[in-house]
Amino acid sequence: MKPGTIELGNASVRVGYPQIIAPNQRGHARELTEFFVSEEYRGKGEGSALLKEVCEQADQGKLMLIMIADSLRLASFYARHGFIAIQANPILMARTPAS
């Protein structure tokens, strides 16, 4: 499965994409700089499935994910996936790899 795709029946549908960068070459953290889900797939669980895939890949690489949530609604979404707020304004969130 390509990043940003979800298997729906026998078809693979691109529902959105994550963009992840390494803030520095030596660290074990990656910044989730963009997380986009196509409007037609919002509110249907596909964004959660995509973020779950991103988190699983980060866990395999033992990578911390960091990101800025643009709103409390988004912060709540990321919190459901293991991110915690580490700064209030802007809302900076981090997720440590699962053991």
Go through each PLM region and give its residues:
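Conserved GNAT acetyl-CoA-binding A-motif
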Residues: A58-D70
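Hydrophobic beta-strand residues in large extracellular and virion-surface proteins
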Residues: V13-V15, L32-V37, L50-L51, L65, ...
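Conserved acyl-donor/pantetheine-binding loop and adjacent beta-alpha core of acyl/acetyltransferases
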Residues: M1-F36, S99
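Conserved acetyl-CoA pyrophosphate-binding loop and the N-cap/start of the following alpha-helix
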Residues: Y41, G45-E53
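Conserved catalytic-core motifs of GNAT/GCN5-like acyltransferases
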Residues: A79, I84-A98
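Glycine-centered loop/turn motif at secondary-structure junctions
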Residues: G9-N10, K62, A79-G82
